[in-house]
């Protein structure tokens, strides 16, 4: 769920997902449309696509099982749908960590018209 995703981002990227990624580029935050603005925004695009492929449970509300050890997150549990959500969140948190250097304040709260071009397929 979103709280677990926030905790993964804190663990992997060392920063708050709510503070840093809730309104970034065209894909980080609510909705998503247009072209990803940079590698960080692409993390959110891929995360949105990943959530879009999940069926049978709600990515934003369901609790999943995971453990974290050192700098790694391991998704667990017997429910395949919940494990998929966990893997979407884990991969995005790792992507944020790996692309910290691309984060650019100019993409915070971008005007909606910036994101009106046609979206690329997942």
UniProtKB/Swiss-Prot annotation:
Compartments (UniProt record): Secreted
Any one annotated GO CC term: extracellular region
Record GO terms (molecular function): calcium ion binding; calcium-dependent phospholipase A2 activity; phospholipid binding; toxin activity
Tissue-specificity statement: Expressed by the venom gland.
Gene3D superfamilies registered for this protein in UniProt: Phospholipase A2 domain
Keywords of the record: Blood coagulation cascade inhibiting toxin, Disulfide bond, Hemostasis impairing toxin, Hydrolase, Lipid degradation, Lipid metabolism, Metal-binding, Platelet aggregation inhibiting toxin, Secreted, Toxin
Known EC number: 3.1.1.4
Disulfide linkage: 26-115, 28-44, 43-95, 49-122, 50-88, 57-81, 75-86
InterPro entries attached to this UniProt entry: PLipase_A2, PLipase_A2_Asp_AS, PLipase_A2_dom, PLipase_A2_dom_sf, PLipase_A2_His_AS
Presence of the UniProt keyword Mitochondrion in the record: no
One annotated GO biological process: arachidonate secretion
Catalytic activity from the UniProt record: a 1,2-diacyl-sn-glycero-3-phosphocholine + H2O = a 1-acyl-sn-glycero-3-phosphocholine + a fatty acid + H(+)
First-listed, main subcellular location of the protein, grouped into a coarse class: secreted
Cofactor remark from the record: Binds 1 Ca(2+) ion.
Family membership: Belongs to the phospholipase A2 family. Group II subfamily. D49 sub-subfamily.
Subunit: Monomer.
Function in brief: Snake venom phospholipase A2 (PLA2) that impairs hemostasis. It weakly inhibits ADP-induced platelet aggregation when tested on platelet rich plasma from human and rabbit blood (15-25% of inhibition at 5-10 ug of enzyme), and dose-dependently inhibits blood coagulation, possibly by inhibiting thrombin activation. Exhibits high hydrolytic activities toward L-dipalmitoyl phosphatidylcholine. PLA2 catalyzes the calcium-dependent hydrolysis of the 2-acyl groups in 3-sn-phosphoglycerides.
Entry-linked PANTHER family: BASIC PHOSPHOLIPASE A2 PA-11-LIKE, PHOSPHOLIPASE A2 FAMILY MEMBER
Protein name from the UniProt record: Acidic phospholipase A2 Tpu-E6c
Natural source organism: Craspedocephalus puniceus (Flat-nosed pitviper)
